[in-house]
């Protein structure tokens, strides 16, 4: 099984507002940058979108390590919030509807195909690829305005 690393980040101006996302895929040292923009969105949607688009770009099942600065996503997966949400008919522990259900469900489909591990990185710190993702995601907002 091929091993791929994906760095991701999402950004949003005004939250909600215009947003951008970036995913950097790395396979055997070769980098591929994916990026996108949405007119009216939230930061969490852009974080999820970056991961989904990164996984969507893979042409076959892979072993993937996703690096993200989103504690929301890492905790939802690694602490199995997502499993609890599904059991509770997509309700949080406070009985509120989970936000971004459409994207969580799409992500779950890719998690069935790929063996994915999520790692939290500190945002706006010393991680070069995370910083690059952040810059690209933010630049998408500026470019598309």
From Swiss-Prot:
Tree of life domain: Bacteria
Gene Ontology cellular-component terms listed: cytoplasm
EC numbers: 3.1.26.4
Cofactor notes: Binds 1 Mg(2+) ion per subunit. May bind a second metal ion at a regulatory site, or after substrate binding.
PROSITE patterns: RNASE_H_1
Enzyme class: hydrolase
Localization of this protein: Cytoplasm
GO BP of this protein: DNA replication, removal of RNA primer
Residues the entry annotates as binding Mg(2+) 2: 9, 134
Cofactor(s) named in the record: Mg(2+)
Pfam hit, one: RNase_H
Molecular function (Gene Ontology), one example: nucleic acid binding
Protein keywords: Cytoplasm, Endonuclease, Hydrolase, Magnesium, Metal-binding, Nuclease
Catalysed reactions, as listed in the record: Endonucleolytic cleavage to 5'-phosphomonoester
UniProt domain RNase H type-1: residue ranges: 1-142
Family: Belongs to the RNase H family.
Oligomeric form and interacting partners: Monomer.
Protein name per UniProt: Ribonuclease H
Lineage summary: Bacteria, Bacillati, Bacillota, Bacillota incertae sedis, Caldicellulosiruptorales
